[in-house]
Amino acid sequence: MSGGASRKPGGTVEHLLHPCNFYGGGAFFIPETGISPKLKGEIFMVNIDDGITAMEVAKSLGMGLYKAACVCRIDGEVKDLRTPINKDCKLEILTFDDDDGKRALRHTASHVLAQAVKRLYPEAKLAIGPAIDNGFYYDFDVDVPFTPEVLEKIEAEMKKIVKEALPLERYELDPDEAIAMMEKKGEPYKVELIKEHAGKGEKISFFRQGEFDELCAGPHVPDTSRVKAFKLTSCTGAYWRGDSDNKMLQRIYGTAFTKKEDLDNYLHMLEEAKKRDHRKLGKELGLFTIMDEGPGFPFFLPNGMVLRNTLIDYWREVHKRYGYVEISTPM
C-alpha cells in the first residue's frame, strides 16, 4: 500500500492516496470511505489522524492485511509497523511476499531463537543473529555443544515464545547506558559492538520482547506470534567476526515462514537436494574420495573412473563428429 498525503494543522492526515498491494488476496472494505479495493495497485483515498501507526492503517484497511503485515515502508525506508505517521509520506504495508517482509520475519525468528537459548542456557553469551537468504542464524558462545537433541529442545522453547505473542518494542539508550546494561547482563560481544558505534554520537537501539532485550536496529514484526512456522536446520562452528584469531562460536541456522505448508515444501526441497548432493552420491556409489592432502580435489575410485572415461569417450566422439582435433598442453 503506497501513496502521498497532506496534513491539516491540528494533526490530521487527509487525502492519503493508496495504491494497495494486497498480497494476501481477497477484498477489504474501509467503512469510513465506502471503498472496497480488490486489485493490487488500486488507488483510493482515506483520512487518518496525525500520529497513527502504520499498524493501525493496515488494520483500518482490513483484518486480512493487518494479520499478513510484517513491516512497512515509509518514503522508501523500511520501518516497524508501530512507527507513527507524522508527516506527508508514501506508505507501503509489506507482507511476507515482499523481500523486506521476509527479512523482518526471519530476523524476528532469530530473536526468538536467542531468547529460547537464554531461557534454557542462561550462561550462553550472545553474538549476532541476522536474517540471511532463505532463513536466519545466530552465533552463541556456549560450553555445551548444540546437538540435534539440543536443537529440538530449543525449538520447543521457541514454540512457547511464539505462543506467548510477545510484542517487540523498540527503544533507545545513550551509549554509556547501553554499555552498562549489556555489561550487567554479561554480554561481552554486545558491549564490543556498542563501543564501536558509540563514537558516532547516536543513541543505541534495542528491541525488547518479554524479559529479553536485544541490541538491534530492526525492523521487526509486531509480535512473536507472527513467526508461525519455523525450523532449526543445522549447527556449525563460526569464528567471531569471521577471524580465526577469535574464539570459535556455535552458529545455529534456521528458516521461518508464515505458513506451515510453505515451510514443509521448503524442507522437502532441501531433502531432495541432499539426495542429489554429489558429495553424498560420490561416497555412496564409490565414485571418488577427498583426501586431507588435496582438499577440494576428487580422487577418482574405480567406479568413478568408469564414469569419467565414458564421459571423455563421448566428448571425443562429439568433437570428432564436428571436425575438431585434440591437442595437449603442459600440465
Model-derived regions: residue spans:
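Targeting/processing segments of secretory and organellar proteins
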Residues: 4, 24-27, 41
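Cationic, low-complexity basic patches in intrinsically disordered or flexible, solvent-exposed regions
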Residues: 9, 15, 39
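Intrinsic disorder/low-complexity segments enriched in small, polar and charged residues
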Residues: 11, 30-31
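Auxiliary tRNA-acceptor-end handling modules of aminoacyl-tRNA synthetases
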Residues: 83-104, 125-129, 137-331
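Ubiquitin-like/PB1-type beta-grasp interaction modules and other compact soluble beta-rich domains
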Residues: 29, 35-110, 114-134, 153-160
